[in-house]
Amino acid sequence: MSQNLIRIATRKSPLAMWQAEFVKAELEKIHEGLTVELLPMSTKGDIILDTPLAKVGGKGLFVKELEVAMLEGKADIAVHSMKDVPVEFPEGLGLEVICEREDPRDAFVSNTYKTIEDLPQGAVVGTSSLRRQCQIRAARPDLVIKDLRGNVGTRLAKLDAGNYDAIILAAAGLKRLKLEERIASFISAEQSLPANGQGAVGIECRTDDARVKALLAPLEHAETRMRVTAERAMNTRLEGGCQVPIGAYAEIDGDTLSLRGLVGNPDGSQIITAASSGNKADAEKLGVALAEELLAKGAKTILDAVYANA
């Protein structure tokens, strides 16, 4: 294979294609003479659209097919939304790069209302995320939450068709797709704690591919890596997949990393929170310790019930 070629395995959704195109542009800008090709693929999570994500089951719904392509030598790298990346990687693959984070917040999208507070009693809100559901229900038990699947365009079309009064989406995805004008308001991390890794893009490759690793190295963003490492460590200790009522959000100020975590009952009846801070070099330890605190407060009971119903 040409030393001047990199092939990116990517999902076919507009957002996944944007992420792959972004990495392609960055690589070609940094490395003169490098050619980057995209290999668009469908994954299990893209194909099964009529079932709530929590019931489709399994970790890595959106990445498995991409990983097979790399292991078979059909692709060199895969670009992922960090919130979709499983905790464990198949032998021979690893997360080589985490790019600088985009806005990690959730976005409130509605054609009629400005904020969640403005929604009338009984208004219908669309989201397939158990994390968002538990936080919305805790704040507004009078709202009706309905499942919402599909890519960003499909979800917006369902809102526009009048199926929902409002929907909740990741702000980063809307910004990347140049749809920021659809955002009625941003939901602060205090109001809706983001998913671990939300807004960050990760690049996976073969662990023994020195050529590709060297080409990818300039895209690594150290601060984002530390923040996401803490968030993912917490999620891992809680044994969370990508469809769980878990929120994790880290911020860095100087050498101090502050981490907030949340586990909630999807019906909003119970939300367990914890927060801690420490040296950013101990990101992983901080994440594990915060998970232990959540477990000590009763998080396991909630998560066991969620997994039993999945």
Swiss-Prot record:
Enzyme Commission number(s) of this protein: 2.5.1.61
Required co-factors: dipyrromethane
GO BP annotations, alphabetical order: protoporphyrinogen IX biosynthetic process
Keyword entries, A-Z: Porphyrin biosynthesis, Transferase
Catalytic activity: 4 porphobilinogen + H2O = hydroxymethylbilane + 4 NH4(+)
UniProt GO molecular function: hydroxymethylbilane synthase activity
Oligomer and partners: Monomer.
Name the UniProt record assigns to this protein: Porphobilinogen deaminase
UniProt source species: Shewanella halifaxensis (strain HAW-EB4)
